[in-house]
Every structure is written in structure tokens, then in C-alpha cells.
Amino acid sequence: MRSGGRILVSRRELIRTGALVASGCALLPWPFAEASTTQELSSSADAGQSWTIGNDRIKRVVTFLPKTGLFTKQFSDLSTQAEFIHQGTAPLRMAQEFSFECDGHNCAGSDATFELLGADESTLPKGTCLAVRLRHKELALEVSVIYCCYDGHPAIRKHLVLHNAETRARRISHLNIESIGVALGPANENTLLTQYGTVPRETYYTGRSEDAGLLVANGLSGNGIAVLSEVPGYMKRTEIDGFYSPGQVRIGVLYDTDLMPFERSIGPGEAFTTASVSLVAFRKGDGFNDPQWLLPSYAAEILERRIDRQGPPWIYNTWEPFHRKIDSAIVYGLIDAAGELGMDVFTIDDGWQREYGDSAVNLKAFPEGLQPILDAVEAKGMKFGLWLPLAAIGTSTAVYRDHPEWAALDQESKPKITVTAAGPKAVMCMASAFREAAAARVLDAIERFRLAYVKLDLTTIFNAYGEAPGCWAKGHEHANWAESLNRIYEGIAFVTQKVYDKHPDVLLDLTFELWGQKHIIDAGLLAAGDLDWMSNVDDSQPNSAGPLQARQLLYQRAASMPVESMLIGNLHADLPTIQESFATAIGSAPVILGDLRKMSQADRQWYRDKIGWFKKLRRSARISESFFPLGSWQQTSPAAWDGFARLAHSGNGVIALFRNKWAGVAATVQLPLMPAGRYKLTSVMTGKDLGVFETSDWVRGIPITFADAQTVEVLEVTAINV
């Protein structure tokens, strides 16, 4: 429908195309109707410019035409020769490139109201970046569109920088970072895997907080695109439309617009940098082009901050079974045992401090302070870690007494209170000056106690147990409640960056409670921290949820998130399930709990031997380059076996198999994507050689027999160089 040289788009069409989602209607520039396909745009009389970003595996060509704006002209997987944009078939509304609303004005990359300022290329340590700089013709607003690629990865990572050149603040909403239409084939051939890339869904889909990695692909050719959003937590929204545009799948990666509506004010002369979005090209079943190789490798090397360089440390944590009843007498016994097991980091969880939000030591539990504890930890060859609540603090603390105005307020303007193991605590707003105080407190603890690892915990934006989100206070750094949501996530990143600026080697663990949802992990969290204490699986008894449910969490997330950033608590080392706990722990970032003092000397030595073996393997083989779930991985069950393989590109690595209560005797392990070659299998549990196998054996399946009472098998895979 035309009106005044523009096209009015219905609500259904608006939502369907992802153009300024849920704004009621959109005004699309008149050239959209005149030049409705990329072919027509490319052949128009406009004097345009094009730039290419890519490497030997991926290529993206972006074009700017004065009458039509910026759009992606070509997106190619050079490894598979797949072309994701077919010239002459992509409607321009499918290729907006980006979009947002600024003070009521609808803005899109493919909008004639933007003019080109220029483009710059720069180099990264292992890649390149392209920055295309635009200026709005009517608003004093500049937008830089940044595209990055990395050596060896078929991925383009994109973000925006919005610069306010006005003398007053601007308000941004409905922010769509990536808006692109890709050609995968007929609509009835396309498939979609959601959440972390493991849950099949219909191809017309809205992704939310847990949709950290979506895989859209052609079910026949296997060609596809993985979408990895670094928008944090509940701010995340992804639109997939594979229904309504024949031959095209519309992908929109944006901040949320309804449940947790994004708003952001940008002050005069200030800039806002969006989260990044990665599009990773793949082909299922095609060797190293398969997402089970590509995504773990990309996520580990690019999205993780530093864990992938040397592998994660083995961490012991005191939370279970001691909770807040931890004291120095208990800790000294645990230190001795943890040292014997070969732990790298000894962490005291909640209970060491006098009050939440105050790093003064609880002298009732630790009468000599923590210095003797620290000395004992280091004497055993370990490093020290502590638990710290970030924004949940006691009202008796100096920071609360001096600055009660920094507290988060609810909708009735009352201070927000969260329930903790130490009773009700105030929730401070991370979108206020409190973030400076929080950063100073974390830095003080790191420097005072020589911390190598910090577990940052508890409520920030809101908790994982139903408390209302955000802050309604006036006078903070957010203009309203909606703006507080993303600003709080920004506040968390502010604290972690302050720490990294002074102590780049410290590992920061951002727990699921800090991020606001049970079992959550996403690339936004990894952009702010190193590790994610992802869950507290009960493992207090042999028949607890324990390792079986820990692996359920692992398998569902490992398809797109780096497993070595996942701390899946709370596996106990002192239970009779010692082999299962160890084998489960090596699937992710290994964290062990339990009363280690109860372990026999034989069990301690067993753990030390196995941990030593795994550390040696991890140093020699980059097993972060893949993750293959095995057996009944989609639903772990006592009635079926499950397992995983973690392999380097060389083929070296580890396979862990769990019999559970399955009545069978042999698990058939199929790894059709195993690199070509010959491989020796050795049982880590028994030391026995199981034989030498070739690629064809892995395709057919190799039967691994469990002995009568055996429930766990761990196999080392070693490539035989001929």
C-alpha cells in the first residue's frame, strides 16, 4: 500500500520481515518498491561502492547505493561453494542489514536516508575487520557497521556502533543488529534447530533467552547458517522466517522488543556499541565443515576470552556439602585432600565473609583470617579462589549505609530484596554508580587474597527464581525501567572489564544466578567473563540427579557453546560414583565438590592419576575443536547408554561412555565425521588396548563392551601416524 511516496506495511508483514518488530507499522523508502531485488539494485544507475570481508573459507560482499543504502550482495561459503544469496531472488526487505528506531524515526541500513561517510579495513591478530561508516541525512546520528572474520573460521561477526552527534540525548529501541535473507532452498526442505542448536522447531520462530545458537539448514544439501547471538541473557531475541518468502529464510538478530523491551539513551557526543552477532556457514555431514566441528572450534577460539589457550583448570569448591557452615578447621583438611587429587584451584564459597557486599573475613569461622588459608593452598601447588556476591548486599554494609540511593527499586519504588542463603539482602542497581563500588570491591579481594578465580554470584537484573526484573529508580544511569534491563548487563561487563584491565589472568565466573536464569549460558556471558557456573545439580546422594542430569545440561548446550566455559555443579568426588563423576567432569570445565576428607587414600590416588592423565591429554590435543554427543544424548535416561567424544582435528582425544542402568553389554560408537586415518583405542579405566580402527570402522560403529559390573568407560583416542 503506497502513501506519499512510501509503502505502508501491515503488522503481519512487519513481524514477518523483522523490520522494526512490533512497532505497529513500518515506513519503507520508495526505492524499495522500485528496486525490489538485489539484482535490480546491483544494476541500477546509482554510483555505489562495494567491499569484501572474508578469508579462504567465507566471503561477504556489502554494497552501498546512495538511493537504497547498505545491503549484503554476496554471502558465500568458500569451503563448500555454497551461495547463500542468489542474485535476482532476494527481496530488499529481506536484506535490511540492520534496523532500529531512534526517537520515533524508523531507520534501516537499506534506507535512502543514510549517506556513506567511508569505509576502513583493519587487521586483528588472527583476522580482519571492515567498518562501513554511515550518517543519517535527517538525524545527527552516525552508524558504523563492523564486520570481522577470523583465520580458519567460516564466520562473519558483526556489530554496530551508534554515535549521537546531536546536542541532546537520543533514544534507541527495536534494535536489529543483523537483518539478512539467505537462500537455502525450497521452504519445505529447510530445517531449524533452536535453543543451543539441538531442539528441532518449525522454521517460523522467535528465539528468546535460551536461543543462544540457532542452526537453519537445508535438510537435503546440509548447507546452513548457524546464528550465534552475543546479546546478553533475557535481552536476546532472534527472528527466523522460513515460511513466507519462497526460496528465502529471513534471519533477524536483535534485542528484545516485548517481554524485556530494549531501550537505550545515548548522550550528546556519546556512542553505544551493540552486542556482536556471528553467522557461521556449515554443511552437515561434510567432514570439518560439519557444525559439530565448526561451532565448538569457533566458540572456543573466538568467543571464549582465554580458556582455550591452555584448557580449563580443575576447580574444587566448598559449597556442597558445607554451605555457609564452612570454617578453617574444615578447610585445612580439604586443602590437603584437594592437593592430593591434583586440583588447580581451591575455592571457598559462601561463608568466608562477614557480610554480603563486604570483604571483611568472618572471624568466627576463620579466626586467623584467610592469609594462613592462602598460604596453605599455595603450599600444595594450587591457586586460591573465592565466592563474591556482586549486587546482593547486606543493608548493614558501609556501601549501603552511605549510598542507599544506589539500591534497585521495584515498581512501587520500594528497595528490591532478594532471598539468599544468608537471608534477605538488598539488590543494588548495576546501572548506577554502585558498579564502581562493586568493581573496587572485587579488585580489592583479588589483590588482598591473590585470587586466581572469582565466582561472581546472585541477583543482578533479577534472579532465577521468579523475582521481578529491572530497576524503577530515578536518578540512575537508566532513563526508565526498560533501559535499566540492558544497562544492568552493561554494568556487569563494566565490572569485569575493570578487573581484566588490572588483572588479565584472573578467571571470572559469572553464575547462572548472576545472569538471571536457570542453567543459562550464552555468548553474551562469554563476552563479559570466562566461565559460567551453569547449574547446581543435586549430587548429595548416590541416587541424586547427579552426573546423569549434569550430562543432560552438557549435551543440550555443547552444540554451540564452548564446553570448557561450563562449570556444571555440584558433582561430589566423595560418593561411590567416583568414575562417573570424573568421566562427566571431563566433558566440560571440571569442577568438583564434596567432603574430600572422607575419600580413601586409594580413591585420592585414583583421582590424581586420572586428572594427571587428562591434563596431559588436554595439553597435547586441542579437544575443544569438536563435541560429539553419543547414544541417548537428547534425553539422558537410566534405561539407555549415553556418552560423548571430544576430538582434536588430528583425531586425538577422548571418548566417555556411561552405561547407566541399561541392560545391554556393548555400546556401539559411531563417529562418521572422524578424520581419515588409523586410531588406537586405549581404556583409561583399565589400561588395556582395545585395538586399532580405521575411518570405515567409525562409520559402521565400534562396539565397546562393558564388563559385568562396569558402568563407565573412558577411552583415549590416539592417531597412528603412518
Role assignments for model-derived ranges:
Residues 3-7, 13-34:
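N-terminal export signals
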Residues 316-439, 453, 463-465, 470-471:
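Aromatic-lined carbohydrate-binding/catalytic grooves of carbohydrate-active enzymes
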Residues 264-283, 655, 710-718:
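Short Pro-Gly-centered flexible turn/kink motifs
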Residues 57, 160, 269, 377, ...:
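Conserved, mostly hydrophobic/aromatic
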Residues 57, 634-675, 714:
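Carbohydrate-binding surface patches
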Residues 693-722:
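C-terminal beta-strand-rich structural cap/linker in extracellular carbohydrate-active enzymes
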Residues 400-433, 486-598:
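Glycan-recognition surfaces
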Residues 39-54, 58-60, 71-251, 260, ...:
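Polysaccharide-binding surfaces and accessory modules of carbohydrate-active proteins
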